[in-house]
Amino acid sequence: MERETQTYFFPDDGRIPNHPDFPLVVYQNALKDTGLAERIVTRHGWSNSWSGSVFPYHHYHSNTHEVLIALRREAVIQFGGEKGAAIPFKSGDAVVIPAGVGHKKLSSSPDFTVLGAYPGGVQYDMKTGKPNEREEAVKQIKQAALPANDPITGKREPLLEIWVK
C-alpha cells in the first residue's frame, strides 16, 4: 500500500491549547517494516525515543513536537482534546503531533505498541490542561523549534511543506 498523508487542524478548546498554526499530520502506511522505525527517525534527526502505549487521558507537550509510529497492532487515538478527532491508528501508521496538540488513547488491542520520538531529541514536558499551566504552555508552544526534517522521509516534504510558517 502507498503512503498517504492527511492533516487535521484543531482550535484551542479552552483546556487543550492545540497548535495555533500547525496541523496534525497523519501518515497512513508510513513504514512497511516497523522494526526499522527507531533507526529511521533517529537518522532523520528525531530521537529521545521510547516505546509503549499512549496515555488514556488527554495530554500534550508544550515544548516540542512528537512523532508516534504504530509498531504493533491498532488503536483509536483522540487528537485535539474532547472535541477533537478519533483517528484509527494501525501498525505502520505514523503521526506528527505539533506542540500543544492533545492526544489520548480511546481504545486499543491489548498489545498495541508505539514508538515516540522528538526533533533534536528534546526532553519533552507533560501537560494535561490544568488552568495553572496554560499561560506558560501557550508561550512555549509558539517557541517550539521547527524540526529540520520530516521524521519519516528525512526530507522537507511532506511535513515542512505542510507546516509553512
Swiss-Prot record:
SUPFAM superfamilies: RmlC-like cupins (SSF51182). Transmembrane segments: none annotated. InterPro entries: Cupin_1 (IPR006045), RmlC-like_jellyroll (IPR014710), RmlC_Cupin_sf (IPR011051), UCP019307_cupin (IPR014500), YjiB-like (IPR047121). Residues 28-139 form the Cupin type-1 domain. Disulfide bonds: none annotated. This is Uncharacterized protein YjlB. It comes from Bacillus subtilis (strain 168). The gene is yjlB.
